[in-house]
UniProtKB/Swiss-Prot annotation:
Assigned GO CC terms: acrosomal vesicle; proton-transporting two-sector ATPase complex, catalytic domain
Tissue specificity annotation: Testis specific.
Oligomeric form and interacting partners: V-ATPase is a heteromultimeric enzyme made up of two complexes: the ATP-hydrolytic V1 complex and the proton translocation V0 complex. The V1 complex consists of three catalytic AB heterodimers that form a heterohexamer, three peripheral stalks each consisting of EG heterodimers, one central rotor including subunits D and F, and the regulatory subunits C and H. The proton translocation complex V0 consists of the proton transport subunit a, a ring of proteolipid subunits c9c'', rotary subunit d, subunits e and f, and the accessory subunits ATP6AP1/Ac45 and ATP6AP2/PRR.
Disulphide bonds in the chain: none
Pfam families: vATP-synt_E
Biological process according to GO: proton transmembrane transport
Identification of the protein by name: V-type proton ATPase subunit E 2
Organism: Mus musculus (Mouse)
Gene name of this polypeptide: Atp6v1e2
Job description of the protein: Subunit of the V1 complex of vacuolar(H+)-ATPase (V-ATPase), a multisubunit enzyme composed of a peripheral complex (V1) that hydrolyzes ATP and a membrane integral complex (V0) that translocates protons. V-ATPase is responsible for acidifying and maintaining the pH of intracellular compartments and in some cell types, is targeted to the plasma membrane, where it is responsible for acidifying the extracellular environment.
Keywords of the record: Hydrogen ion transport, Ion transport, Transport
InterPro entries according to UniProt: ATPase_E_C (IPR038495), ATPase_V1_Esu (IPR002842)
Length: 226
């Protein structure tokens, strides 16, 4: 039976409707897949950025913490240095005061003469040279000459050796020095310093742990800011 034009038109419409439905379903499927992929990619990007932000702030937090530690350490060191400097200044002031007190000893000629006798003999016994030169302040020449005269027989008795001692008449210790003597070998290559300043400095060095202990307590510097 032959198809009429109406039947043909109906079949064409039916086929067109089927194709259109198929196309719509395919388009919806593509849209759904695209949206799914978009959401997956968006989630991945969001997670990546989130991790980057977390990593950034974690690093910043560590940097801030490290800076705080450095600043705290610097502050502690500065405070420690300030305390140590103040202690050193106090000790220097005490030594300065002690040196000023030496002038009182020198001003009493009897006491100073007795001290020079001991300083000269001690220096001779330390140097132990056959010929020695004694140098002093210009204002102490007469006292030192007397001290040398008394020291020579004591030296010879103790060492069983003869010696020659010259009091330097041309070169002297500074007149503003605290006092005492320097004793040289004949070629002046060896020297024993027995000035009042050197004796004070030596005593201060030897007694420094005790001085610090009295002033600041035992091992205070070691315990400071620990």
């Amino acid at each position: 039976m032959a198809l009429t034009d109406i039947d043909v038109q109906k079949q064409i419409k039916h086929m067109m409707a089927f194709i259109e439905q198929e196309a719509n379903e395919k388009a919806e499927e593509i849209d759904a897949k695209a949206e799914e992929e978009f959401n997956i990619e968006k989630g991945r990007l969001v997670q990546t950025q989130r991790l980057k932000i977390m990593d950034y702030f974690e690093k910043k937090e560590k940097q801030i913490e490290q800076q705080k530690k450095i600043q705290l350490s610097t502050m502690r060191n500065q405070a420690r240095i300030t305390v140590l400097r103040a202690r050193d200044n106090l000790i220097l002031e005490l030594l300065k005061d002690a040196k000023m007190r030496l002038s009182r000893i020198v001003s009493d000629e009897e006491i100073y003469q007795d001290l020079l006798d001991k300083l000269v003999l001690q220096a001779l016994l330390r140097l132990l040279e056959p010929v020695m030169i004694v140098r002093c302040r210009p204002q102490d020449l007469h006292l030192v000459e007397s001290a040398v005269l008394r020291a020579i027989p004591q030296y010879m008795r103790l060492c069983q050796k003869h010696l020659e001692v010259q009091v330097d008449q041309t070169e002297h210790l500074p007149s503003n020095a605290a006092g005492g003597v320097e004793v040289y070998s004949s070629d002046q290559k060896i020297k024993v310093s027995n000035t009042l300043e050197s004796r004070l400095n030596l005593a201060a060095m030897q007694k420094m742990p005790e001085i610090r202990g009295i002033l600041f307590g035992d091992n205070t510097s070691r315990k400071f800011f620990t």
